[in-house]
Amino acid sequence: KPPNVWRGSPAEDLCDLDDIVEPVVFYTGAAREAARDYAKNANVAATVALAGLGFEKTEVELCADPSISSNVHDVTVEGAAGTFRFEIAARPFPDNPKTSMLAAFSIVRALANRTTALVV
């Protein structure tokens, strides 16, 4: 994510967000700590952990990247059958750049799914 969205998080103590000129990985570890310490920024990591191996076995890297304007999530799944990788580059929500516009759409879909017989 862009450096400005990490303001108000522990990332401010780990790197100088104002002077970053190239991507800086400031957290590498389990999804549990990422979700706890970066609650406003690591919801995709938490979602992947819930859908996959759990919070302890899901590995997370958090990065401040001054070259991007989107909230980018790079997900890699490795297993005996092979490797699967995909990237989400979502535009930040105008009122809260720490989250993406996709988050609002996900909430709308979740509410719609509660009122329909067919869930997509």
Segment roles from a protein language model:
Residues K1-V120:
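Active-site-lining helix/loop region of Rossmann-like oxidoreductase modules
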